[in-house]
Design a protein with these regions (language model features):
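N-terminal assembly/transducer modules of large multi-domain enzymes
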Residues: 2-132
Length: 132
């Protein structure tokens, strides 16, 4: 039994479907927002929107008790909170780290679709890059 079956067994089917619909849309929009963090004219809007995306993922996955997702989303949300205090675009290491984070969340979406166990978080994602 995979993650989708676990959720369907413990929560109303409509709640699970709504989560997956919204989660899928957030995953689809992440990459372009991350890349836009390196553009001066797009930085503020992108960092604020990414913060909102990870906050929403953290909240929804917390409600559904998807612990690895909640923990990683919280970790990224904290990093984005630091980035929100800045005015200049981020460096390449930060963009690459966030793209790797996005890949992890996309892998989890595939795990949901295929009703597999959630893929383990890559250790490298838990090492925050230099945000300067």
């Amino acid at each position: 039994m995979g993650i989708r079956s676990d959720l369907n067994a413990n929560f109303d089917y409509e709640i699970v479907d709504e989560f997956l619909d919204h989660y899928s849309m957030m995953i689809d929009s992440m990459e372009i927002m991350i890349i836009d963090l390196s553009k001066p004219n797009m930085y503020r809007r992108s960092v604020d929107e990414l913060f909102r995306v990870f906050h929403n993922i953290k909240s929804a996955s917390g409600f559904l008790k998807i612990e690895p997702m909640t923990r990683l989303a919280s970790f990224v949300e904290e990093a984005l909170e630091e980035l929100r205090k800045r005015t200049k675009p981020v460096n390449e290491n930060t963009v690459n780290w966030l793209l790797s984070v996005s890949d992890m969340f996309a892998q989890w979406l595939n795990d949901f679709k295929q009703d597999k166990e959630l893929t383990h978080v890559k250790y490298s994602l838990l090492k925050l890059p230099d945000l300067e």
